[in-house]
């Protein structure tokens, strides 16, 4: 049996909110089987829990935000969720003392480190995968995203930026997902932004925590970060990282091929909602044997069985 996973123990980190610029403390804690991922605002009295479900994503401008019926939000969840998806964590309670997840270094890598530091515990219940049975597609102008049947989880992603630095880089990546491929090739890709946009955002009290410490910053011609890029194709890889996080609000690891052109948070969420609304397009499956699983979430050394 392939089992569900949670973290072995609580782990804590402090960072800065991308938009507020304020200090944020994040705690990741174990959760029972079939809990899913639940986020909790501990700065509210009483604390407010918001389950990570596609229908709770009600804000997709500049980030992905979960918002409950009372309008209480937790923003910038996508990099943390990419790490949860990449390591195959099914169940966790995540507490945060602010309206946004800390931006850390602008990638998923610090969250991968946190989860690995907490340890990964296998639980006594079968892991469920969301298997795509037929194609589902959403479009917005020339942008589009699609999920279709595939034995593992493949990502086929293309961006199209006219900026000379991005245009010079590879803007099309096809990869077959595994935890090791995610950690090595995707997790360190940072969010990127243009100096002209950052100036506008700050004038509107946004991106107050943004800096070259947590983003790739470009002017009209080049990357301004003194250390340059982490990957030659960091731009498209960060868009893939965002998509991993955005798709994980489906509630399960996906078995299928995700193909996208110029998509962002809004279209990614539309795709998940469209998929879940068409119940003949997917099914939940479990696996008895490791050899039968078409996606590898390699269990790190030291994982224990509950």
Swiss-Prot record:
Pathway: Glycolipid biosynthesis; lipid IV(A) biosynthesis; lipid IV(A) from (3R)-3-hydroxytetradecanoyl-[acyl-carrier-protein] and UDP-N-acetyl-alpha-D-glucosamine: step 2/6. GO terms for cellular component: membrane. The keyword ATP-binding does not apply. Keywords: Hydrolase, Lipid A biosynthesis, Lipid biosynthesis, Lipid metabolism, Metal-binding, Zinc. Its cofactor is Zn(2+). GO terms for biological process: lipid A biosynthetic process. GO terms for molecular function: metal ion binding; UDP-3-O-acyl-N-acetylglucosamine deacetylase activity. Transmembrane segments: none annotated. It catalyses: a UDP-3-O-[(3R)-3-hydroxyacyl]-N-acetyl-alpha-D-glucosamine + H2O = a UDP-3-O-[(3R)-3-hydroxyacyl]-alpha-D-glucosamine + acetate. Pfam families: LpxC (PF03331). This is UDP-3-O-acyl-N-acetylglucosamine deacetylase. It comes from Shewanella sp. (strain ANA-3).
